[in-house]
């Protein structure tokens, strides 16, 4: 009986969505799906790392596919197709990068490259209706070009700004979080050719749901702000900013699409409020003018953000299931931080004081984090563990693009992915949440707790070994990650057998 049930669950995951060819990406969709990001400056984190924590939300028959693509020297500059007809002149060399791929999706992938530059994003619908683009503009390829070419977060922001101004952005609006081991930026882009980026202060934390969070802007202060030179003038000309009536320019107010009048159910305000409340330890009113960034109550450990990414407003007036008594908390009238459309989650640490194999690390969950566990992953591993991802690891512009949007070949092998087992458990849990959550916490939660508790010693041992024998240190780190993924796979098998 359980075998039949499992087969039924897996069958439900095999529905294939049609995908476009390599020069025709789909129209931007799902713009209001609720991703969520927390950024912690290096002086606000417990260990001096820049931290980026993110829930990715999307819909459809998506594979969460982890890949580590090797650096490549093509020997000559390359001309890149951006997907809708525009061409980009790239250099001869591409950086290696870790790729958290959501197949067929235009705006859902996250990257960490060999220089420790991280790129992820949150949809932030703008009020711009005019599509000002050249040769189809740029959408999907924006973040991948940053991963392939940028050596620092600031360089990535500048490159992204040039790309947006040159080609025009195809989506309604989005905020890209771009970070490295020294600093983090949030870059807000608007349909067409306008953008603005703000640096998160080292001793502060920033939270973003799915609306712009940049408020005051001073483009004369290049250490804190970057952006389109005509940003304010364009807002005035468009009728979105009246200096005489409004006073100082406010980017969110000028460019953001107005949300629903009911702030409790607008999908963003509660999630913003919850992050602020938990990280500051202060009381915030629903609808306050929330700051772009803030000082946390105490220094933030990376692992502590896992609980925040799993949050459903438990213990608040907005806990709509009364502690899971009435079913899944992922499908209620109050859109939660962890929600029905969350497809993956990660907490990334970017550290300047760690040896190369440990400098960029992730806690990665390949589905909704409330019904799975976070597994350790380091950029410095020699290769990804079995079950993490599918597809070749060598760089080829056209092939990687085509495989991403035409994923039938990957889906034909999806039973090899840990992601498939995780989805089967997730489907079972959503149908009987309180009972399954208890089992999941007992099995997966215990293993995750063990991984977190042992992390400091592991990294200390690897650091010491790296000073003596770099190859052996990488080998042991790779074996550790492989072992963690293998044990997790066995635990999912246990959950699916009963």
Task: Show the residue positions of the predicted features.
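Bacterial N-terminal signal peptides that target proteins for export
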Residues: 1-9
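Short, Gly/Pro- and small/polar-rich lid/capping loops
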Residues: 25-37, 321-327, 334
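Bacterial N-terminal signal peptides
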Residues: 8-17
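Histidine-centered catalytic/metal-binding microenvironments
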Residues: 428-498
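Substrate-recognition/cap regions that form aromatic- and gly/pro-loop-enriched pockets
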Residues: 318-450
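Short, well-structured alpha-helical segments that form the helix of a local strand-helix-strand
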Residues: 156-165, 305-309
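Accessory, solvent-exposed terminal regions and/or long lumenal/extracellular loops of proteins
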Residues: 263-331, 335-340, 431, 447
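A contiguous strand-loop segment
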Residues: 26-139, 159-293, 297
């Amino acid at each position: 009986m359980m075998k039949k049930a499992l087969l039924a669950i897996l069958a439900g995951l095999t529905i294939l969505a049609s995908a476009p060819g390599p020069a025709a990406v789909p129209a931007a969709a799902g713009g209001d799906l609720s991703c969520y990001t927390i950024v912690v400056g290096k002086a606000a984190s417990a260990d001096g790392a820049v931290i980026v924590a993110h829930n990715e939300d999307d819909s459809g028959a998506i594979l969460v596919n982890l890949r580590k693509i090797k650096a490549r020297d093509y020997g000559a500059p390359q001309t890149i197709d951006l997907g809708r007809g525009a061409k980009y002149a790239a250099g001869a060399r591409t950086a290696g990068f870790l790729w958290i791929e959501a197949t067929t999706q235009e705006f859902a992938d996250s990257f960490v490259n060999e220089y420790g530059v991280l790129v992820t994003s949150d949809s932030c619908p703008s009020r711009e209706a005019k599509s000002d683009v050249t040769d189809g503009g740029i959408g999907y390829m924006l973040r991948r070009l940053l991963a392939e070419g940028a050596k620092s977060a600031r360089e990535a922001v500048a490159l992204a700004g040039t790309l947006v101004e040159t080609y025009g952005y195809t989506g309604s609006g989005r905020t890209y979080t771009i970070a490295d081991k020294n600093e983090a930026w949030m870059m807000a882009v608007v349909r067409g050719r306008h953008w603005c980026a703000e640096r998160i202060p080292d001793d502060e934390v920033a939270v973003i749901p799915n609306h712009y969070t940049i408020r005051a802007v001073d483009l004369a202060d290049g250490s804190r702000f970057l952006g389109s030179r005509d940003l304010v003038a364009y807002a005035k000309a468009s009728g979105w900013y009246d200096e005489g009536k409004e006073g100082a320019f406010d980017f969110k107010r000028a460019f953001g699409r107005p949300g629903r009048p009911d702030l409790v159910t607008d999908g963003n305000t509660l999630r913003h409020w919850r992050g602020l409340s938990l990280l500051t330890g202060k009381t915030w009113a629903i609808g306050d003018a929330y700051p772009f960034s803030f000082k946390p109550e105490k220094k933030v450990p990376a692992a502590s953000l896992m609980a925040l990414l799993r949050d459903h407003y438990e213990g608040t007036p907005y806990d709509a299931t009364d502690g899971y008594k009435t079913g899944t908390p992922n499908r209620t009238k109050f859109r939660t931080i962890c929600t029905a459309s969350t497809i993956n989650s990660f907490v990334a640490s970017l550290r300047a004081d760690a040896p190369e194999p440990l400098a960029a690390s992730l806690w990665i969950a390949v589905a909704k984090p409330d019904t799975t566990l976070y597994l350790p992953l380091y950029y410095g591993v020699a290769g990804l563990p079995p079950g993490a991802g599918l597809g070749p690891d060598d760089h080829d512009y056209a092939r990687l693009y085509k495989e991403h949007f035409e994923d039938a070949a990957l889906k034909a092998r999806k039973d090899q992915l840990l992601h498939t087992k995780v989805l089967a458990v997730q489907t079972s849990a959503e149908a009987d949440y309180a009972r399954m959550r208890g089992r999941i916490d007992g099995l997966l939660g215990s293993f995750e707790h063990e991984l977190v508790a042992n992390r400091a010693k592991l990294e200390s041992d690897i650091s010491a070994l790296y000073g003596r024998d770099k190859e052996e240190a990488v080998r042991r780190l790779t074996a550790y990650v492989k072992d963690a993924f293998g044990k997790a796979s066995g635990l999912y098998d246990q959950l699916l057998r009963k």
